[in-house]
Amino acid sequence: MMIKLGIVMDPISSINIKKDSSFAMMLEAQRRGWEIHYMEMNDLHLDQGVAIADTKVVQLKEDPNGWYEFTSEQTIELSELDAVLMRKDPPFDTEYIYATYILERAEEQGTLIVNKPQSLRDCNEKLFTAWFPELTPTTIVTRKAEKIKAFRQEHGDIILKPLDGMGGASIFRVKENDPNVSVIIETLTNHGQNYAMAQTFVPDISNGDKRILVVDGEPMPYCLARIPAKGETRGNLAAGGSGEPRPLSETDLKIANAVAPTLKEKGLIFVGLDVIGDKLTEINVTSPTCIREIEAAFDISITGKLMDAIERRLQAQA
């Protein structure tokens, strides 16, 4: 049977096809002869409780001058699609949450949503690590400046971050005698109105912040180590880091295997774990990336494994 696959993403016209994981996923689906329905967030609607979408059937090619062509436009019930990839980048704001409710209505009518809408809401990318405290750096989450200051007093060298950033935005390293600590805390907590996370600094960041991909509970054997630019503490590619594909170390695999069963159970089919040294720092569930860089360096089809997982789940549902 021909699978109809929907994808909700940021505008396809502005992606970098060399690096875009959503593009890689669509290429693999197209290779399998699936029909791909492209959507942006504003194409999703509810009508009397029924999830509706304005979709464009898209064809793709690996051509930096023109990588997509829309072949038809239609308004359909989302439940007409076999599966939908939710690949919208953060911010994880109320609009994003509303979109997950629309997708959940389609899920209730039998459409497979990757990742599961309820789990997208439940598993904040920074906070979800709290369910695995034995794997993470020492961590607190608070709005109170005095608690963060006491944490810094105790640990000396710490990282402060908001709970809703992506690409390394607003991540601060605060050392023992940093004169800016108060203003950093005020900025991050919005004067005590917002929660922020404080973690002990993991010195291994100079060796890279590793992105480990997990597909339907199976850790991929290779990761992308994102090496910080000189003088930086953030490895994120968006913050100027450079990517170095590598095989997983034993420790990487141990961490991934510890988290993977929970991910699978929660319907989190495609997830990116961030690991620094031997510590888990983030669990990315919204729109993890780094497929292209890993596939270019090693003989592996991560997108192939993802589409296999989708096929398996669809067969199990049938």
UniProtKB/Swiss-Prot annotation:
> For binding ATP, which residues are annotated in this chain's numbering?
151-208
Cofactor note text: Binds 1 Mg(2+) or Mn(2+) ion per subunit.
Biochemical pathway: Sulfur metabolism; glutathione biosynthesis; glutathione from L-cysteine and L-glutamate: step 2/2
Cofactor names from the entry are:
Mg(2+); Mn(2+)
Q: Which UniProt keywords apply?
A: ATP-binding, Glutathione biosynthesis, Ligase, Magnesium, Manganese, Metal-binding, Nucleotide-binding
Q: What EC identifiers does the entry list? A: 6.3.2.3
**Reactions performed catalytically:** gamma-L-glutamyl-L-cysteine + glycine + ATP = glutathione + ADP + phosphate + H(+)
Which residues of this UniProt protein bind Mg(2+)? 282, 284
Record-level Gene Ontology MF annotations: ATP binding; glutathione synthase activity; metal ion binding
Cellular component GO terms held in the UniProt record: cytoplasm
Q: Which InterPro entries match?
A: ATP-grasp (IPR011761), ATP_grasp_subdomain_1 (IPR013815), Glut_synth_pro (IPR006284), GSHS_ATP-bd (IPR004218), GSHS_N (IPR004215), PreATP-grasp_dom_sf (IPR016185)
Listed Pfam families: GSH-S_ATP, GSH-S_N
List the Gene3D superfamilies hit by this protein, alphabetically: 3.40.50.20, ATP-grasp fold, A domain, ATP-grasp fold, B domain
Q: Ranges for the ATP-grasp domain?
A: 125-311
Which NCBIfam families does the record match to this protein?
glut_syn, PRK05246.1
| Family recorded in the similarity comment | Belongs to the prokaryotic GSH synthase family.
Q: What is this protein called?
A: Glutathione synthetase
UniProt organism field:
Vibrio vulnificus (strain YJ016)
Q: Write the lineage as a comma-separated list.
A: Bacteria, Pseudomonadati, Pseudomonadota, Gammaproteobacteria, Vibrionales
Q: Which gene encodes it?
A: gshB
